[in-house]
């Protein structure tokens, strides 16, 4: 047996197994860091690509990540600590609209494409479901939380994203 380099002992098959487990734990894909997966959109996307579903549930206060968004809108509601969806914009969008459809009192919290940019939404007119309409969406990764105005309310929803 040859002397190991860097004075690291040879551990054989066991070290390969440990390395494989460590790699799989640390190399978790982005979609695994959300409750309901990822959405990848390019300009001109179809209506089907812009619709996802999930359900609300949680007691994590969304305002702890930001009290107000970049437009001065208050950030409210409760959700799970993990984002519900990961949105990947492959190119810049001049305008996007995100609309929750649940029939309940929902809220929206979107963080991205950097940790400092926040967009929040609450009621839409007379409708208690949340929506956000905003301009200048840069290409990148966005974390989306769908919350409810009250803690631990479970409600099925559809999220519609439109240009």
Regions found by a protein language model. Give the residues of each.
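Classic N-terminal secretory signal peptides
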Residues: 16-23
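Generic structural detector for well-ordered beta-strands
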Residues: 40, 86-88, 99, 133-135, ...
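Predominantly extracellular/luminal regions of secreted and cell-surface proteins
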Residues: 30-67
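Non-catalytic, beta-strand-enriched accessory regions in extracellular/secretory proteins
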Residues: 66-95
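Hydrophobic beta-strand segments within beta-rich accessory/binding domains
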Residues: 86-102, 108-109, 142-146
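Noncatalytic accessory or regulatory domains flanking protease catalytic cores in secreted, cell-surface
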Residues: 109-160
């Amino acid at each position: 047996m040859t002397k190991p380099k860097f004075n690291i002992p040879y551990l054989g098959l066991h070290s390969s197994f440990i390395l494989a487990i460590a790699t799989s734990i640390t190399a978790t894909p982005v979609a695994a860091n959300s409750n309901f997966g990822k959405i990848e959109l390019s300009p001109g996307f179809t209506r089907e690509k812009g619709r996802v579903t999930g359900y609300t549930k949680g007691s994590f206060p969304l305002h702890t990540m930001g009290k107000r968004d970049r437009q001065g809108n208050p950030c409210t509601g409760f959700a799970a600590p993990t984002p519900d969806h990961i949105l990947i914009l492959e190119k810049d969008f001049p305008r996007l609209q995100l609309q929750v459809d649940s029939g309940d009192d929902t809220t929206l919290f979107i963080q991205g494409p950097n940790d400092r940019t926040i967009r929040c939404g609450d009621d839409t007119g007379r409708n208690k479901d949340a929506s956000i309409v905003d301009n200048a969406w840069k290409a990148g990764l966005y974390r989306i939380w769908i919350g409810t105005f009250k803690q631990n309310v479970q409600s099925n929803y559809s999220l519609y994203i439109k240009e």
